[in-house]
């Protein structure tokens, strides 16, 4: 899920990095879209009621302020940061030292498929709020979440069991899926 020191070859490897843009999500989004860099990114968002000048309206806002994911090599991001230094790598403090937080491509693909629908029944969780031990590994076949891999678990506060995609140490997202679209995954490797 993460690496501490990169070799020259690893610096060129494209992966999903967890990044922070403190109070600059919109600027980060605009700069990452820029044709010069054109880095792939994802900011988990949801609709929330906000009041501006006494008027309530539903706005699409980041789920976790300042959190974004960038799909690029370490070298590409470092080059981007030379010009726009507001983007920071999210790090874990481990016994071996600080490590960059990265997410495997297949986990991120499943996460994006659920999170990008912006539906009201899509729910986000902190990792410690979800107990995946009682869940069953599943893959969704058909529907709008086709090929999403996650855990089918009962989530507190929800009537039906839901498919949960966990990004270890970062966040989780869940969606309600009809059980007829699910099949059990045979191997834990499918979830990595």
Question: Where on the chain are the PLM-derived regions?
Answer:
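Acidic-enriched and Gly/Ser
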Residues: 2-134, 159, 167-181
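Short, surface-exposed secondary-structure boundary micro-motifs
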Residues: 143-144
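Short coil/loop residues immediately preceding or within conserved phosphate-binding loops
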Residues: 135, 147
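Short beta-strand-centered aromatic/proline hotspots
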Residues: 148-155
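Single conserved hydrophobic/aromatic residue that forms the stacking wall/gate
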Residues: 183-192
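N-terminal beta-strand motif that seeds the catalytic metal site of vicinal oxygen chelate
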Residues: 163
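A short, basic/aromatic helix-end/turn motif that makes direct DNA contacts
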Residues: 155-156, 189
């Amino acid at each position: 899920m993460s690496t501490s020191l990169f070799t020259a070859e690893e610096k060129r490897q494209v992966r999903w990095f967890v990044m922070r843009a403190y109070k600059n999500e919109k600027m980060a989004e605009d700069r990452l879209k820029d044709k010069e860099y054109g880095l792939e990114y994802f900011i988990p968002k949801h609709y929330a009621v906000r009041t501006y000048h006494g008027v309530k309206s539903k706005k699409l806002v980041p789920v976790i302020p300042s959190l974004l994911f960038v799909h690029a090599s370490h070298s590409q991001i470092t080059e981007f940061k030379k010009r726009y230094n507001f983007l920071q790598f999210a790090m874990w403090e481990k016994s071996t030292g600080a490590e960059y937080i990265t997410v495997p491509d297949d986990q991120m693909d499943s996460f994006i498929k659920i999170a990008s629908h912006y539906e009201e029944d899509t729910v986000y969780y902190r990792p410690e709020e979800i107990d995946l031990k009682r869940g069953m590994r599943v893959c969704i076949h058909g529907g709008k979440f086709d090929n999403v891999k996650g855990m089918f678990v009962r989530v507190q506060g929800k009537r039906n069991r839901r498919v949960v995609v966990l990004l270890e140490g970062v966040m989780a997202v869940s969606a309600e899926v009809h059980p007829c679209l699910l099949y059990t995954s045979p191997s834990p490797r499918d979830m990595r």
